[in-house]
Amino acid sequence: EKMRNGLLADFSAPEVQESFRHCKTLLARFRTMSTYDADYRSVLEQLIPGIPATTVVVPPFHCDHGHGIRLGEHVYINAGCTFLDGACITVGDYTLIAPNVQIYTPHHPLDYRERRESKEYSYPVTIGKDCWIGGGAIILPGVTIGDRCIIGAGSVVTRDIPSDSLAAGNPCLLYTSPSPRDS
């Protein structure tokens, strides 16, 4: 509960470790699957409860818990993505996430003494509807990306991106809003 609310949480706590264990057991099966395997949907629905039938996650995929991931309708997550879901990760309808995208919600304390005690904060990440997140992009804790955004491949998104934006780079910079004919 502390994790989901941005409070300093102990990730070595038994309930957190049990959540990790459950997730890793499902991921061990999921990583070896194809989207065409008979059990694919069943394992995916156990991993990410409430996932819409129209949403696809291509293995291999990595997450910490799975139950912190909220995906909209017609979302497509390509192979090799990592979603560290200590806090909620929300992805809007019709969003495309290219291969090897990493979304992080955990943020370790700056004080080394707290890091030694297996403590961390987690801040939610929200990606709007109709977005395209380019391959290898990294989205840091607490970021919100508005609707209809394009994030360039390899970008490191450190701050919020407003709707209808094209942003890219390391750190990710806002370049333009898409033209009306591209909408």
List each model region and its residues.
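Charged, compositionally biased N-terminal leader segments and the immediate start
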Residues: E1-N5
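Extended, small-residue-rich solenoid/repeat segments and analogous flexible loops
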Residues: L8-A9, P14-G68
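Short, hydrophobic secondary-structure boundary micro-motifs
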Residues: F11, Y112-R113
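Left-handed beta-helix
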Residues: A53, V58-P59, D64-H67, G72-E73, ...
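Histidine-centered active-site/metal-ligand motif
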Residues: H108
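SAM-dependent methyltransferase catalytic-core segment centered on the flexible catalytic loop
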Residues: R115-S118
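Walker B catalytic motif
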Residues: P171
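Conserved small/polar residues in nucleotide/adenosyl-binding loops
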Residues: Y175-D182
